Amino acid sequence: MKLGMVTYELGKAMDLKTLLATCRETGFKAVELRTTHAHGVELGMPEAKWAETKTMFADSGVELWGLGTVCEYHAVDQAVVRRNIEQTKQWIELAAHVGARGVKVRPNGMPKEVAQEKTCEQIGLALAECGKAAADAGVLIHLEVHGAVSSNPKLCQKMMEACDHPSVGVCWNSNNNPDEVINGSIATTFPLLSKWIKSCHITELSSNYPWRELFRLLKESGYDGATLAEIPASAEPARLMRYYRALWEAYQA
């Protein structure tokens, strides 16, 4: 496995050149770029920037792990769902142009007026449509285990079963909540999603989440991808990232 970062908070104000230089300096090997932040990798970016972005990542040795979108498919209003599917397809096209491995999407809640099983199926079918577009473009879809109620691994399992597309995987999100961590362990919840895991977010490694168990289970499942730090910003990002990498490496021992 390798250490990377999500620019949701840490790194969000960095332009792409600064971000890649900081990652290279601190030993971070992969990046998920949160969209709408300072990096400039967005829908509508000039086509001339596509190759430039791809080259910048290639020259840096840092992998563009994914584009972190807020596309979601749980809405009751089907027009909203359709709009999110079509926007996901646009992100997929951009990901292919700039050399990103994947596109991160999410569930973001479960409407109370709709049966959970129906919403899970709706999300899964939307993911399957996006998965076909992703396969055609040579990228992946990463479904983040996210949202109130919808982050329950049992529900995400239902979404993935309804999806059933090889280009769609799960982004394990290291949620320290009772749906995921049971009696201090993820031994019963991790297996629900392990066969689909294609990405992984990690948070503050100083928290009481079972980090050693997570890293062991990831390795045992055959996962050899990035574990992406999604942590608060710092006035000294490079200094924080060095300490974070040291702690991450200690957990691998």
Predicted stretch roles:
Residues 1-4, 12-27, 150-253:
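Histidine-acidic metal/acid-base catalytic patches
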Residues 14-17, 21-24, 54-63, 73-170, ...:
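Active-site acidic/histidine proton-transfer and metal-coordination neighborhood
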Residues 42-58:
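Glycine-rich, positively charged N-terminal anion/phosphate-binding segment
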Residues 9-13, 43:
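Short, N-terminal intrinsically disordered low-complexity segments that are rich in Pro/Gly
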Residues 6-10, 34-38, 69-72, 108-110, ...:
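Active-site beta-loop-alpha junctions enriched in small/polar residues
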Residues 40-43, 114, 178-181:
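A generic structural signal for short coil/turn motifs at secondary-structure boundaries
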Residues 2-7, 30-32, 61-68, 100-104, ...:
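Structural preference for beta-strand elements that scaffold enzyme active sites
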Residues 27-45, 68:
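N-terminal substrate-binding region of glycoside hydrolase catalytic domains
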